[in-house]
Regions:
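Bacterial N-terminal signal peptides that target proteins for export
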Residues: 1-8
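Bacterial N-terminal signal peptides
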Residues: 9-17
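Cleaved targeting-peptide boundary
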Residues: 22-30
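A short glycine-rich, His/Asp/Glu-containing loop-to-beta-strand
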Residues: 29-62, 66-67, 117-119, 123
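Histidine-centered metal-chelating micro-motifs
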Residues: 57-59, 79, 96, 100-106
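Short, conserved beta-strand element in jelly-roll/cupin
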Residues: 64-79
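Short acidic-glycine-tyrosine-enriched beta hairpin
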Residues: 84-101
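Ligand-binding loop in jelly-roll beta-barrel domains
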Residues: 101-125
Length: 125
């Protein structure tokens, strides 16, 4: 009975760990100084608030699980790369539209933290 209790406790701990990991931002250490926080995650839309420390880089990546993606700088100095175009300075208040699968990355080129809001319209919505 003691062994059975230990096995059940271990399984419960494993399930708890797996379910809690699925709710956390994706790989927070993959890009040091880049801190994403999910503000909303529904079947039709996902909204992230991303804080970037000075010099932090969000490496080039794609989103294949969304129809489109809006990138909206809120504060700071962001350099944004979209596809093969030259990087642009993304000023606060501007909005950038990206189709599904568009490679993009960004970095904080300023001396203070920068904040970006990302809105994703999910596939099937």
């Amino acid at each position: 009975m003691n062994k059975r209790t230990s096995v059940l406790t271990g399984l419960a701990a494993l399930l708890f760990t797996l379910s809690s990991n699925s709710q956390t931002p994706p790989r927070p250490n993959a890009n040091p100084g880049v801190n994403p926080v999910r503000l909303m995650d529904r079947s039709d839309v996902r909204v992230l608030r991303v804080e970037l420390q000075p010099g932090a880089v969000r490496s080039v990546h794609v989103h294949n699980d969304v129809r489109y993606h809006l990138f909206i700088p809120v504060s700071g100095q962001i350099e944004l790369s979209i596809g093969s175009a030259e990087p642009v300075t993304a000023a606060p208040g501007q909005a950038y539209y990206m189709e599904k699968g568009t490679p993009h990355g960004f970095r904080n080129v300023g001396s203070s933290p920068a904040i970006v809001v990302e809105v994703f319209a999910k596939d099937g919505a």
